Amino acid sequence: MSDLENIDYYDYKALLKRARSQIPDYVFQKDRFELPEIEILIEGNRTIIRNFRELAKAVNRDEEFFAKYLLKETGSAGNLEGGRLILQRRISPELLKSRINDFLREYVICRECGKPDTKIIKEGRVHLLKCMACGAIRPIRMI
């Protein structure tokens, strides 16, 4: 309580300074979130994302969840095999990159602060995206 006794309750700047001092430093950092370069290989009628496991780790999401999203959005059958995602049709690299960016916007990046430090939690029957940086919570649709 001694910290609160020293504050003039009408001094907005002092209160603001105190509140800001209690927020972790990493919240104020402006580091850009960069995804590793996507390694796409087209073999016949199959498209392979060679570094899929690395991509999933970079965005801190389960490989199965990420793969399910890409398979649904590209309208393709496919499977995970040894850290690679194999899609059973030819898909342009531009389309894949676009769908991966859509995934990041919907399931990774916080809409409030723009940071990728989020996790998916479940409360009852609702899935939520919770930001670990700013504390924002928003509902998301599951795949």
Swiss-Prot record:
Record carries keyword Protein biosynthesis: yes
InterPro entries xref list: IF2/IF5, TIF2_bsu_arc, Transl_init_fac_IF2/IF5_dom, Transl_init_fac_IF2/IF5_N, Transl_init_fac_IF2/IF5_Zn-bd
Domain of life per record: Archaea
Keywords, alphabetical: Initiation factor, Protein biosynthesis
Molecular functions per Gene Ontology: translation initiation factor activity
Subunit structure: Heterotrimer composed of an alpha, a beta and a gamma chain.
Function: eIF-2 functions in the early steps of protein synthesis by forming a ternary complex with GTP and initiator tRNA.
HAMAP family reported for this sequence: eIF_2_beta
Family: Belongs to the eIF-2-beta/eIF-5 family.
Protein name, entry field: Translation initiation factor 2 subunit beta
Species: Methanocaldococcus jannaschii (strain ATCC 43067 / DSM 2661 / JAL-1 / JCM 10045 / NBRC 100440)
